Amino acid sequence: MELVLGPLEARVIGALIEKEICTPDQYPLSLNALVNACNQKSNREPVLELSELDIRAVVDELIRKRLVVNTAGFNARVPRYQHRFCNTEFGTLKFSEQELGIVCELLLRGPQTPGELRSRTNRLCSFDDVTQVDAALAALIEQGPYVVKLPREPGKRESRYAHLFSGEVDLQALAEASPASSYASPAADRLSVLEEEVETLKLQLQALEARLAQLEG
């Protein structure tokens, strides 16, 4: 693939895709909402603390790459950002709902097993069983490849999968990182879902407050 995303670019694209699906009423995102989405504590690995300046620099580069567009009018005070990463009229990347859910989750949390992907993508799409996850992963490998199956870790029953939108996976660096998310329990995943719902409610509240301020003004 010619497309290569840096780590922060992958985070921004993943966050935009997630919010497009989960909170369409607040999408496209303002810069502040995008910062909050990128720094979200749930469904993120690693958790980051990026500033508006950090995100603006990343967004500017993604706009240059034609992967993000500001949909606000020229004279608008608040920019609104929308991704053009995939499933656009003139773009080459086309994913099904399930494939997009997997891609989004891999962009936001890094390598994961099919079982983890099934439980963690439930806010983005639905899988009846792990077999459907395997089929979607196989399609992503065949089409691109856009994902890769990693060597199974010692003592683990399932292999993890990683996206290839940031280039080839550095297996040594990945092994040294040993992210805790790879060992998350079902209870931790349920907590993550609840935290995501709280973040969604915060975004909805911010949107309501902004509308109220406009009416009062």
UniProtKB/Swiss-Prot annotation:
Lineage: Bacteria, Pseudomonadati, Pseudomonadota, Gammaproteobacteria, Aeromonadales
InterPro entries according to UniProt: DUF480, WH-like_DNA-bd_sf, WH_DNA-bd_sf
Highest taxon, organism lineage: Bacteria
Pfam families: DUF480
Family membership noted in the UniProt record: Belongs to the UPF0502 family.
Organism: Aeromonas salmonicida (strain A449)
Protein name: UPF0502 protein ASA_1460
SUPFAM superfamilies found in the cross-reference section: Winged helix' DNA-binding domain
